[in-house]
A protein has these predicted regions:
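Conserved class I S-adenosyl-L-methionine
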Residues: 1-40
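Class I SAM-dependent methyltransferase SAM/SAH-binding core
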Residues: 46-48, 52-100
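A conserved beta-strand element that flanks and buttresses the S-adenosyl-L-methionine
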Residues: 111
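Short catalytic micro-motifs in class I SAM-dependent methyltransferases
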Residues: 114-117
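A short glycine-rich, Lys/Arg-flanked "PGG" loop and its adjoining helix->strand segment in the class I
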Residues: 125-137
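Conserved beta-strand signature within the Rossmann-like core of class I S-adenosyl-L-methionine
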Residues: 138-146
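C-terminal alpha-helical "lid/dimerization" subdomain adjacent to the S-adenosyl-L-methionine
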Residues: 146-201
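Core SAM-dependent methyltransferase catalytic element
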Residues: 205-223
């Protein structure tokens, strides 16, 4: 039985994720670069759906004065994060989902990486409204998600590219098919346009695309 919503148990997640998510390590690079330009000296940073703590570790290493709060609905993922950040100070952990966040005007930055595409539209709205509420005025929300293409034709092309990528990175034909079957059953990706629309409706004053490739995209939104 899996111990989280992703395709891999927490114990093997780090060793497998790059085989199914093209440019996975680029997500963190883009987030750190934007955060640095945004200015985060002595900031509070909430990472919801923190997983095994890959982003948080990079944040702690690059921005030593940042106070981190890491949340994840999977206790096993959170334990992996605790182990990875055992030597880092200024880090707190909570075993809750984005839908359960209860912060108000507390953080300068909120991130959610590969966390909300497991949710229905209503659940996604609640999760991202909670992220909005957690931010101080002028704070920034950065999220990376699996996405859907805007047309059936472009979706087919993107899926074909993704399949080729997985096969080239050691996944078997059966494993690749199983990953693709998760779309629409375990994963519920939405288009770039839908992402931007929801974030604006929640109340963010500035919403834009940060990065995109294959079937993944990053967005940033300012409160």
């Amino acid at each position: 039985m899996k111990d989280n919503s992703s395709a891999f148990n927490s114990s093997i997640y780090d060793s497998k994720v790059n085989a199914v998510l093209p440019y996975y390590t680029e997500y963190n690079k883009q987030i750190l670069d934007l955060a640095e330009v945004f200015g985060i000296k002595n900031s509070k940073w909430l990472d919801t759906g923190c997983g095994t703590g890959n982003l948080a570790l990079r944040v702690a290493e690059k921005f030593a004065d940042v106070k981190l709060v890491l949340c994840d609905p999977s206790a096993e993922m959170l334990e992996a994060s605790k182990s990875k950040l055992a030597e880092c100070y200024n880090v707190k952990f909570r075993n809750i989902s984005s839908q359960e966040l209860d912060y108000k005007n507390e953080f300068d930055i909120v991130t959610a990486v590969q966390a909300h595409h497991y949710l229905s539209i209503d659940e996604r709205r609640k999760a991202e409204k909670n992220c909005y509420d957690a931010l101080k005025d002028g704070g920034i929300f950065i999220t990376f998600e699996n996405i859907a293409m805007s047309t059936e034709q472009s979706e087919m092309l993107a899926i074909a590219r993704w399949k080729n990528y997985m096969l080239a990175h050691g996944r078997t034909e059966e494993q690749t098919e199983n990953h693709m079957k998760r779309r629409g059953t375990e994963l519920f990706p939405i288009t770039i346009e839908e992402h931007i629309k929801i974030l604006k409706e929640i109340g963010f004053t500035s919403v834009d695309l940060l990065w995109g490739s294959y079937l993944q995209a990053g967005f940033f939104a300012i409160k």
